[in-house]
Amino acid sequence: MLKSKTADFDSKQKLSIALNHAYGMKVSYGLTGYGRQVALDIRFQYIRPERVKDPDYIHEVVHMMDQILHHALFDQKSFEEAKYLLASRLRRQNDDPDSLALKMAFALAAEDHDIAIPIQGALEDIEALSYEEVVALYESWRALPRFVSCCGTLEPVMEAFLNAIPQFEKPSLRMALIPRTSPSFQVLEKNIAQTSIVQVWATSTPIDSSRYYPLLVLNSILGQGPMSLLFEEVREKTSLSYSISSSLVRFDGALLISTGTSADSIARCLRLIQAQIQKCADGQFSDEQLEIAKMDLIDMFRRQQDRPWAMIEQLFLDSMLERSESLAQRVETIRTIERDQVCEVASRLALVSMAIVKEDFDETMEN
């Protein structure tokens, strides 16, 4: 609803025309989970004023930002439209086996943990939502202080506008790692072309721990890097999977392994996945794999210096974690990671949930 209309631009068309008139000014919105908090970020991107031969241009940009941040226009019609679009998106996600398996695995991982709460909501909650609740939430949100950051050169008028926004010194951080529990399993059969498997492994490694950078290296070696064990052993050598990778849910202390395979290959895939984790715990990876994983991470942090949004996101994370590392310090920390540090974090992994959305082969479809 925030992106629909404002007091001065009371239709989607008027708002779109105004953004285009401001030399294609861009606005985007996003929700991101950080442990027990959810951040709503609003991003603005505009051309540097010295490149525009219009003395009023920067004032036009500031006016657009003020309208979007402080004067969003809500009504029952836009509420019903937003509600319909969100519900439709969630239904499409439930029809996608990868998204469905991920949602199921999170729900199984820890029923009372934040990881089990879908950030985009649940269909039953959306259907029960009222217009009055959304308006009340918006008014509460408007009163909250913000975390404001920018990448680029600020003109005095823009700097004055941003400084007038109530801000907090640093974002708060509330997080709890998913507990190590006996694993939970769920299998759902659907009329689909391939099986999707999502496993959630507890890492027992908080993001502000000294073990966090070794965990990043482990994730690269295991399933995220270009020479990952999962890719080489499960997909390339045995052709048991169509896709396989690992990723981290940093603030919840979770490592995900996502696999696309066939129903008759499930058991063999799972055995091989377990074997690769054990390899990491036992240090059975090459020096080359270790160095490539470290260089990939270093390159990722260096590439951030060329990407404004990545720089802002890193600043936000560092502010939350009260971390003041320079790029050089971060690079040096990664370079000095040893094999035994990677083995240690691998040995801490514990499977807590697994969801399988399995193809239900119907012979009548083939005939």
Regions found by a protein language model. Give the residues of each.
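Short alpha-helix boundary/capping segments
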Residues: 3, 7, 53, 57, ...
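His/Glu-based metal-binding/catalytic segments typifying zinc-dependent metallopeptidases
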Residues: 1, 128, 170-229
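Charge-rich, well-structured scaffold segments of protease-associated domains
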Residues: 15-172, 237-367
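A broad, low-specificity signal for short, low-complexity segments enriched in glycine/proline
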Residues: 1-7, 105-113, 160-164, 179-182, ...
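Active/ligand-binding-proximal structured segments within catalytic/core domains
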Residues: 1-22, 65, 209-222, 230-234
